[in-house]
């Protein structure tokens, strides 16, 4: 798939695999909107990527991925600014190294909210634009 002139949203794009994916997509000519858990983290990643690719279009947002309306609003705003979303990379996730017998319900909910509900919400929000134009790609990492 050619990435030139495609609009991609990458959740968890401020570090690790998400950041590397954003880097590769920008290198190939895509417009990248990355999400991070805080706007500060998103801004830092965007600044680093803009330094490397000064002519590229890259932006950072920090919706609450466990809240559908927060994600919808952020993705709709991104689409109105940069164009309909062509590619969604569901990469955001969290893990806990707590032994299972010490895992609390609160910890379980935190992990499920991002790792499961976050993927659902991002996919649901991105698919609105994709369905309207009749195409799109959704990738999920694990």
Label each residue range with its predicted role:
Residues 6, 55, 84-85, 130-142:
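Active-site loop of short-chain dehydrogenase/reductase
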Residues 7, 14-16, 38:
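Conserved glycine-rich cofactor-binding loop
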Residues 28-45:
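Conserved glycine-rich Rossmann-like NAD(P)H-binding loop of the short-chain dehydrogenase/reductase
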Residues 39-40, 62-73, 105:
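The beta1-alpha1 cofactor-binding region of Rossmann-like NAD(H)/NADP(H)-dependent oxidoreductases
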Residues 91-96:
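Conserved NAD(P)H cofactor-binding loop of Rossmann-fold oxidoreductase domains
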Residues 99-100, 107-109:
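Substrate-binding pocket helix/loop in short-chain dehydrogenase/reductase
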Residues 123-124:
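A short, exposed helix-loop element centered on a Lys and neighboring polar residues
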């Amino acid at each position: 798939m050619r990435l030139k002139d495609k609009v991609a949203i990458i959740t968890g794009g401020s570090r690790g695999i998400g950041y590397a994916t954003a880097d590769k997509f920008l290198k190939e000519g895509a417009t990248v909107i990355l999400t991070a858990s805080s706007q500060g983290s998103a801004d830092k990643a965007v600044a680093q990527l803009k330094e490397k690719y000064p002519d590229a279009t890259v932006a950072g947002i920090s919706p609450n991925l466990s809240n559908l309306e927060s994600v919808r609003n952020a993705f709709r705003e991104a689409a109105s600014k940069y164009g309909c979303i062509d590619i969604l990379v569901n990469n955001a996730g969290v893990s806990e190294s707590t032994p299972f017998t010490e895992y609390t319900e609160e910890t379980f909910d935190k992990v499920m909210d991002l790792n499961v509900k976050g993927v659902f919400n991002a996919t649901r929000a991105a698919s609105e634009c994709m369905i309207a134009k009749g195409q799109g790609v959704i990738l999920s990492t694990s």
